[in-house]
């Protein structure tokens, strides 16, 4: 793909990430970002990070376990726990290390982890590091989930782990049915809200809140690198679970803590999310507009119910070609190929932010229609 000039990765951005970015000196429409709330370039979020660096320095030079706990880490944890409706929360330096560190602590030999086969790679790595038996069910197939639960020893721990919003396809977990099966088989549930936080539920509290099932979900995970305009992640649960994780999650104990700037920026973004409900309204306005326009234009967009819109190509090379030709037209989108999806499900991922306009969506769809027709995909 490099020789053909269609290698689509590591493209350099020369400034802030907003709805438009500068790349190679040219204006490019950004539809490849996870910044759903549109806060990565917000002056208040930036200033909060700058002020924290001035107060605390550039880094913590230690683990949370030792010298790396700042008062703003604890403040962010308290506010996140209240926001998602759990007793306590624990912050990690990245979202990936939440899943890869927390999951191995929750089950042991003779226990079971049951995952959707489209769950994020960090969940996959987390379950690989556990000593439990790992089962998976077909994507959002509740009959298959029940079949996997029936294989489990009824007396063992059974942990169902699921993405609230699936990061490539944009569809939601069938949380009401998962909760019903949890009770039927005496299981527990962990929901990864990486792409649900800031998007679904009251004030963007996530998919668990959207379904009104926060109290039925045992652990809620989230990241700061998407709607909270920073980097890092957290797990929220009952006090006893958080205390156990504090003293056992290796990625928490043996990693340096999140930087002051990252922590303060996430905290400020969380405040803005709660103070500006119109941000969420704007996101859903432009999302619904884009969904309608893509369907009218004949694109295959699957079962998405979110600002993540998959444009199915179903061919790896053509997926790369779409990405390259769209970029040449001034539209940044992301290619999704195996192992992030099945070989027959390759797609380009088009994602929206709260500050995208209808005009930007129209321009992008016009250019993508041209590209898809050029490759005989429309």
Which residues make up each language-model segment?
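Conserved PLP-binding catalytic core of the aspartate aminotransferase-like
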Residues: 10, 281-289, 295-329, 340, ...
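Conserved N-terminal alpha-helix of the aminotransferase class I/II PLP-enzyme fold
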Residues: 47, 51-95
């Amino acid at each position: 793909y490099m020789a053909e000039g269609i290698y689509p990765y590591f493209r350099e951005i020369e400034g802030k990430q907003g709805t438009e970015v500068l790349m190679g000196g040219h204006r490019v429409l950004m539809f490849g970002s996870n910044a759903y709330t549109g806060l990565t370039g917000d002056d208040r979020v930036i200033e909060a990070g700058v002020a924290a660096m001035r107060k605390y320095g550039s880094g913590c030079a230690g683990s949370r376990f030792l010298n790396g706990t700042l008062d703003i880490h604890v403040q962010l944890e308290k506010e996140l726990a209240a926001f998602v409706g759990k007793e306590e929360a624990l912050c990690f330096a990245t979202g990936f290390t939440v899943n890869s560190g927390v999951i191995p602590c929750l089950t042991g030999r003779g226990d079971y982890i049951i995952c959707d086969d489209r769950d994020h790679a960090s969940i996959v790595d987390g379950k690989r590091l556990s000593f439990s038996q790992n089962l998976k069910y077909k994507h959002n197939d509740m009959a298959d989930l029940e079949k996997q639960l029936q294989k489990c020893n009824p007396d063992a721990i059974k942990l169902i782990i699921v993405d609230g919003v699936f990061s490539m396809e944009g569809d939601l977990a069938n949380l009401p049915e998962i909760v019903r099966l949890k009770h039927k088989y005496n299981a527990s549930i962990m929901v990864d809200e990486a792409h649900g936080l800031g998007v679904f539920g009251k004030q963007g509290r996530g998919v668990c809140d959207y379904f009104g099932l926060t109290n039925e979900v045992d652990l809620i995970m989230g990241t700061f690198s998407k709607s909270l305009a920073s980097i890092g992640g957290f797990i929220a649960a009952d006090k006893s679970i958080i205390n156990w994780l504090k003293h056992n999650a290796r990625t928490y104990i043996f990693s340096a803590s999140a930087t002051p700037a990252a922590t303060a920026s996430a905290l400020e973004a969380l405040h803005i999310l709660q103070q500006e409900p119109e941000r969420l309204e704007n996101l859903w306005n432009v999302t619904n507009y884009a969904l309608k326009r893509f369907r009218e234009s004949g694109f295959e967009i699957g079962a998405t119910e979110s600002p993540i819109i998959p444009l199915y190509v179903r061919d790896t090379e053509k997926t790369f070609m779409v990405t390259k030709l769209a970029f040449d037209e001034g539209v940044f989108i992301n290619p999704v190929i195996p192992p992030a999806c099945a070989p027959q499900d390759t797609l380009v991922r088009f994602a929206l932010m709260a500050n995208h306009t209808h005009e930007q969506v129209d321009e992008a769809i016009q250019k993508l229609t041209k590209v898809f027709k050029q490759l005989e995909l429309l």
